[in-house]
Design a protein with these regions (language model features):
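C-terminal secondary-structure termini that scaffold catalytic or DNA-interacting sites
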Residues: 1, 237, 248-269, 276-278, ...
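C-terminal catalytic core of Y-nucleophile DNA break-rejoin enzymes
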Residues: 43, 47, 239-241, 250-251, ...
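Catalytic-site neighborhood detector that most strongly recognizes the C-terminal catalytic loop/helix
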Residues: 246-248, 362, 381-407
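Short, polar N-cap/turn motifs at the start of nucleic acid-interacting alpha helices
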Residues: 232-239, 372-392
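Basic/aromatic DNA-contact patch characteristic of tyrosine site-specific recombinases
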Residues: 1-74, 78-81, 85, 100, ...
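Short, basic (Lys/Arg/His-rich) helix/loop patches that form interaction surfaces
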Residues: 197-208, 218, 272, 288-298, ...
Length: 415
């Protein structure tokens, strides 16, 4: 017996409906299908064309193994929570920073979005709102992107979405806001000398001299300087060992405190020859601590003790305390130098705004001006990427080249 041919079904506009397609009495279109685990799912749309576009995408997802069953309920928050748990290689400080930024700026709004619904334009709009409404600067935006991009990458790898909607967003944001990576500039030799001399001869700021001398004589990071212990300083062989960082960060309970971390890369572990001026500064610091009683301080951080640089209360300096002191010092200096220059009818040697990290950059610049072996510079600085060293070297040698040609004026006969 011949099989009865199925009758055609039409929508309210007379268009033939395909298998699985339906139109309700209220005009809404729907498409019924089974997901990868055999459970019936339904797509809805107000137009047939839109329904068929959704249907085509869903069928493609099913062919490619995209998890259409869960994608309707999984949120950005769900994916981030999975990402941060699986990212076991993150340092505690980095992990806590990511969590802090996510909880404060992403979870409540953007994080509530359904994972599969997030488009490129959604990410761009979110980034733009952080810049305009929250006043985010390039560095903060980089952190947000560093959190979201791998979160969506994990979603792609787990077959929840087809492509990463954060791809290319930061490049467009930087272009539209004319952002360029902030360059850290070194102090000139004149500015460096003026700064150190002012500190050394000041009744108010002279206690900072050993710390700043060590910064400018080693090129260490601020976490390496404040974490330096007496046992890391070999005065017999004139060697300083850098093997850990001391960081001050917010913990999961919301409180802030000091913690020890190991360098992120092997290049961070290194030994630095102790310059005579640095040795003198460190011995002066020890003498001052013995005098005021802080040398025998028992402050312990994660099992580490015997820290070199302590304030008058015997406590470790916080990075923000050092940077605040730098600002106070150069502002006081600039004020006095401006008045003195007016009296002497000369141009003042003013010190620009800078932070503790600029002292590291200043040391590296002086080093580059006097050393041609890039590999040695990289090892002393603890740069994991030699391109970082090369960029500073190029900037330093370019300035030296300009100075050399200025000195040639009138000394070379051309015609």
């Amino acid at each position: 017996m011949a099989r009865k041919k199925a009758s055609k079904r039409y929508d309210s506009k007379g268009i033939v409906l395909k298998t699985g397609e339906y139109q309700r009495k209220d005009g809404m279109y729907l498409y019924k299908y089974k997901d990868t685990i055999g459970k019936q799912r339904i797509l809805y749309s107000s137009t047939l064309a839109e329904l068929r576009a959704k249907k085509e995408q869903t069928e493609q997802d099913l062919r490619d193994g995209i998890k259409t069953a869960k994608e309707n309920t999984l949120t950005v928050n769900d994916m981030f929570d999975r990402y941060i748990i699986t990212k076991t290689e993150l340092k505690d400080s980095t992990r806590n920073n990511y969590k802090y930024m996510y909880e404060h700026y992403i979870r409540e709004q953007f994080g509530q979005k359904k994972l599969a619904s997030v488009k490129y334009s959604d990410v761009k709009a979110f980034y733009t709102s952080l810049i305009k409404d929250k006043g985010f600067k390039p560095n903060s935006m980089e952190v947000i992107h560093t959190i979201l991009h791998p979160t969506f990458t994990l979603a792609v790898r787990d077959d929840y979405i087809r492509k990463n909607p954060t791809n290319g967003v930061m490049a467009e944001i930087k272009k539209s806001h004319n952002w360029e990576k902030t360059k850290r500039h070194a102090l000139t030799e004149a500015q460096q000398t003026a700064f150190i001399n002012f500190v050394a001869n000041s009744d108010i700021y002279s206690h900072w001299l050993p710390l700043f001398t060590t910064f400018l004589g080693t090129g260490c990071r601020v976490g390496e300087i404040i974490g330096l212990r007496w046992k890391d300083c070999d005065f017999d062989n004139n060697i300083i060992s850098i093997n850990h960082n001391l960081i001050y960060r917010q913990q999961e309970d919301g409180k802030c405190g000091f913690h020890i971390t190991t360098p992120k890369t092997e290049s961070g572990k290194r030994t630095i020859p102790m310059l005579a001026e640095v040795k003198k500064a460190l011995l002066l610091e020890r003498k001052n601590q013995v005098k005021n009683g802080t040398f025998f301080n028992n402050m312990v951080v994660d099992g580490y003790k015997g820290f070199v640089f302590l304030n008058r209360f015997g406590c470790i300096y916080k990075p923000m305390t050092i940077n605040s002191a730098i600002v106070r010092i150069y502002k006081t200096y600039n004020e006095q130098e401006t008045k003195q220059a007016e009296k002497e009818k000369r141009e003042p040697i003013l010190i620009p705004h800078f932070s503790a990290h600029n002292l590291r950059h200043t040391f590296c610049t002086r080093f580059c001006e006097n050393e041609t072996n890039i590999k040695i510079i990289q090892e002393i600085m603890g740069h994991s990427d030699i391109s970082t060293t090369m960029n500073i070297y190029a900037e330093a040698t370019e300035k030296k080249k300009q100075e050399s040609f200025k000195n040639l004026e009138g000394k070379i006969k051309i015609c």
